[in-house]
Amino acid sequence: MQVIFQSGGLGTRLYPETLNKPKCFLKINNKTIFNYQYSELKKYNLHKKLIIITNKKHEQHFINFFKKKHNKPKIISEDPIWGSGGSMIKNKKFFQKKFILIYSDIFFKINFKKFINFKKDKNKIICHKSNHVFDSDTIFFDKNNRITKIFSKKEKIKLSNISLSGIYFLNKNIFNKLRLKKIDMANIIKKKIKNKVIYSYYSSEEFFDFGTKKRLLKLKKEKFNKIKKKLAFIIDRDGTMIDEKNYVNSIRKIKFLKDFLFFFKQLKKFNPLIICITNQSGISKGFITYKQIHKLHKFLNLKLQKKLKLNIDVFYICPHFPEKGFKGEVKKYKIKCSCRKPQSSLFKLANKNYNLNTAKIYNIGNNISDMVPGIKTNIKNNILVNRTLKNNIII
């Protein structure tokens, strides 16, 4: 498998440390970050077909690194700098039909074999929960992991904390019909998702974007011998998150429970993945449409973002209800399904889509039916809330 390692930036946010060297040649424990990155590639035999794209100021650092190595990469030195996307368009003639693209300012320790085998041969990007969304490109993706929307790092309000990690699996033809110009890779993806399927591979493995002094300092304090598993919360909606006295079919009826807001605020310091799994039988009964549900959830997230600078990362919805006799009911949803709680298929899907560690998941709901699917999927921490999130029972 060919790997394109992109190191074209000047690292201005890390000056003066990067005045004459690329970011990945900064040292941690007397070892360059590139040394760690290269070791990870070797572990999965991804070092043999390596292309390094850099600029003329930094080229010699890579030449020196590989002087005594058996496998020599192709080093492309370019000036002027075209941006992460423009550089790929300019050099696509050197790429194989399928390849992995990695940004040089990402410290990573991931299972590349698992990533490559996910959605075999399809365009995909490793995504993760970011704690610095203000300077990250963030995304929405659907239950099939297809990326549906990208929020540019320049956008002020973002309704997602899931960001692009800087590691891609791409087919060369994604650059077809693109003219050479200065452009970021995220903007190319933004254009392509309109008519091309690009998948998100969510990983709970740790990624560090060390592109600022503050984040570089944090990276230096970390231990690298273990991959950290991130916390995840699966939260029920009605009766746990919002009041369920009246059927919620309009934004006017959304009323957050005070104890939920108190609890949700505490989550911010842990930066966990937050998933909402909710039964919405009103869709099958004809009380509300999928489109209206999505509008409600967008509004709900907007309110959380404004109040707490935090939001739900993804909503999983079961629209089914088998009992018939409702005026305006939708026949295709009048079935016995495997996703309506207490059934567990949406929990399994969330587990699969996000590569979760069940020991690190907290499942929270106000009914026993919310607890059962957690237990079925081996979640260790199932919390039944009794009116308030402060008084709860761990099952």
Give residue spans per PLM region.
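Conserved Lys-Pro-Asp/Glu-containing loop-to-beta segment of HAD-superfamily phosphomonoesterases
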Residues: V330-I368
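Substrate-recognition element of Asp-dependent hydrolases with the DxDx(T/V) motif
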Residues: F260, F264-L300, N311-K324
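Catalytic-core segments of class I nucleotidyltransferases/pyrophosphorylases
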Residues: F99-I100, F107, K113-N117, S130-V133, ...
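Short beta-strand-to-loop element that shapes/binds the nucleotide-sugar donor at the catalytic cleft/hinge
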Residues: K124-F141
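Active-site neighborhood of HAD-like aspartate-dependent phosphohydrolases
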Residues: K230-I274
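Conserved N-terminal catalytic core of the sugar/cofactor nucleotidyltransferase
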Residues: Q2-F5, R13, K27, K31-F107, ...
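N-terminal nucleotide-binding beta1-loop-alpha1 segment
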Residues: M1-L19, A232-D238
